[in-house]
């Protein structure tokens, strides 16, 4: 709410904006909620910074890997490509590979900050909007904006009840309850998992270092780990 933001912004030099609804799947059937909390909530913060009197000098916004959609791949025929969502007709046949028109098999490569942005969920769209608003509005009032595109964060304090916090929390809950771990598809889909302490360290550096101002950073381990390995 406006009053919450007004209280949060008082006497602060820097704001680390984590307030958001999370969950790519959930966002597809709770569209209004995600847009209202993530986009409108960020707009409310920025509106206060623009029109109020605060001491804030820097805003760090928590973005997400989800803004890249399926990510970056290399095609022998076409070079770097950015596939859209996989089609159910292929997945129903047990074919879980990402495809691209007029291309043979694709090779997954690291998705850097210069890669194409094309979110495949409402959640991803809202995170893209959040970072663009912060990086666009903040400089107009002398505030440095920084966007961190966090990968799959895990560690102490992570909810084991919320199914939208990622597979590590889901697997942990299954193990804790003495259940078998269910792996969907072929288990070869991969993610970059980053420990929460590393995320905290990166975020602190973003606050302290002027070199981070007005920049976008991926925050991850830099290593693809497939689901079978995690399990």
Regions found by a protein language model. Name each.
Residues 30, 48, 52, 174, ...:
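Generic structural signal for alpha-helix termini and adjacent loop/cap motifs
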Residues 128, 141-143, 153-169, 177-179, ...:
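Glycine/proline-rich active-site loop of Rossmann-fold NAD(P)-dependent oxidoreductases
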Residues 29, 37-40, 114, 121, ...:
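Residue-level signal for the nucleotide or nucleotide-sugar donor/cofactor binding architecture
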Residues 129, 133, 137, 167, ...:
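Hydrophobic alpha-helix immediately C-terminal to the catalytic Tyr-X-X-X-Lys motif of short-chain
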Residues 1-151:
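N-terminal Rossmann-like NAD(P)+-binding domain of SDR-like oxidoreductases, especially those catalyzing
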Residues 70-75, 158-162, 230-231:
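Short aromatic-enriched loop/helix-cap "lid" or pocket-rim segments at secondary-structure transitions
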Residues 7-8, 174, 202:
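CheY-like receiver
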